[in-house]
């Protein structure tokens, strides 16, 4: 079929509309420039020889520099095909080859046309993805060349748009630009795979025994739950108490063969609507906290219950803080002991933080951060802080668990600038073990010195997220004018410092060491307890847990205090420290914890200060077992090249051993010693009865006790699981006199229960809160007293004609009689925590 002749096509070829437009416009078109315009940094370089004196011209796979016929830059393959279109002598009909022949022929598309009309100066076309940015980056893979940019404004697009180059050091530059996603990384979850305490282990051989699985994973830490019901389907779920144990198991067992199958391990993200049992993910929310209380003071208070991972603040709510523990058991202990206690004159409230808060708030936090007006270096989140089932705080994600993508280009610029591409001091960048891909070899030894010997022209930036890092590397960067380690986190001088004259205490650098010669910026200490100079300081060794608060010795006073006897120090008002005391932050008066009877016993109270501060002759100083030979700043030298992943794991195992010993010692103080009781050396009276069958009611249990011990006790409490409407497996009883404990112990301890054919064996231990008065004080202000009367604690007359009979329980001066009835069912929380209602069986001393 013949087509009409196109007046603008002399050869009878079907010309695309865009070409017709150009022909109709002729040379007078305002959109056609007879001379090729120079190209800016976004669209390429018109004159590559501009950089010929400093860098060889690097060919780009999509740049053909000039078309000899037109003298016009050809930027991609589409333009090359259009060149063939104009020079084709055969006069083919391109109508049926339309998708192979691009039609814009160097004319801008519609967006470019409109952009050219409204703005004749700025180049048209805005890149909107990392892939397009890479096309225009001539130096992105050649020599690590970085253009001069402002270190603060270089993160205008937000940390979510940061790309860290993969490969060797110096082999990439960061790209910034609008991104169509918020920091998405490779992984099976929307925001990547977040470290959590629960591991989803796939590719499991169904013949593997549960004990074999437990022994394999238990070497990395105590296992909270082991779910193997789906083992026949090829996967199991393993949950740890400590998130560090989960991360260690992930790294140590990923792709390891088990019964000829390689394990495929992933982190399991907590449910959006968790059960009460899953609610505790190691993070507590502190409400009604006085804004004058610093993070260091909070760390000191809560650090007595376990190692603090980090403390986060909410920008708009200064009286709220989030405190995250490594171990969920520490969070439970702190929740039970400190909830509704008074700190700095205010009664605080503690609640467990619900999982999923980070995912829900990540986009909102990132957007909120970007919109702020203050310099962006003041909002840089801590790189090493993983997103781990905890609320507000936005973290950038820099690597995928499945990609070998270390932070290799962070400080690898050949220009010698110690600042990272996102304007972040290296001293605040986490170590290799926390940022290395999960399940891969870290290969960090090649890059470790990048963070150890760097010039740092900028001081440390303030962070809303105060993370206490793991001790994974023996050395971190430090230079005059940069607050690092304890200086930045605790506001104290370096407890363990070294001088340049003693290089033996650090492994030799690979190649030639780069001395630190940066001038001091003159920052002061943040609420330091003692003045210290920042001038001339060199690299330091951190012998506390870098990433957790220093255990037992956070400041200059490296002593803990251990009560020699369990006396009434349970209710002492404890003043924290003298030299590095808690109160030295703002007014130097010392922070008083007015917890009265709610204060808890701590086997090694991490309270820095003098023994006289506690006014107790039974306190004696002990050395922290974690400090070892490094107690006075002299670490154990491990030889050249001894840093890296292997030694970090070994140190982690050593810490776990220390922690196990510490926990064993902690449990000993709750064990009953009948000999001491007979001699009168141990005067405690409150006992915890463990391993009670869940179907037992208060009436049943009291009937068993009253058979031989009626009138020997004055307090009884059987906690109830309100969800399942049964007891939680333990109870508390206060004996009138310690002498009654011996017979009670002989009657119950190690004996099986008569009812329900239970296999459980009763066990006795001391409770944490001791004495009738302390128990009443603990419960009378609890929200439990507002719930069902049948689940409340019970008081008994201890003398007189009514001895052994119930007496009213005082609640805020009002006596309420509590009749004892069978089938105790309640809907409240026995310890005043409205959220955590599902109480599990716990070890001795953890509940009261």
From Swiss-Prot:
Domain of life of the organism encoding this protein: Eukaryota
Gene3D superfamilies linked to this entry: 3.30.70.330
Cross-referenced CDD domains: RRM1_MEI2_like (cd12524), RRM2_MEI2_like (cd12529), RRM3_MEI2_like (cd12531)
SUPFAM superfamilies: RNA-binding domain, RBD (SSF54928)
GO biological processes: positive regulation of meiotic nuclear division
SMART domains, alphabetized: RRM (SM00360)
MF terms in GO: RNA binding
Signal peptide positions on this chain: none
Listed Pfam families: RRM_1, RRM_2
Residues annotated as domain RRM: 197-270, 282-355
Region (Disordered): 370-400, 455-523, 826-848
InterPro entries xrefs: MEI2-like_RRM1, MEI2-like_RRM3, Mei2-like_Rrm_C, Nucleotide-bd_a/b_plait_sf, RBD_domain_sf, RRM_dom
Keywords: Repeat, RNA-binding
Role played: Probable RNA-binding protein that may play a role in growth regulation.
Official protein name in the record: Protein MEI2-like 2
Species the sequence originates in: Oryza sativa subsp. japonica (Rice)
Gene assigned in the entry: ML2
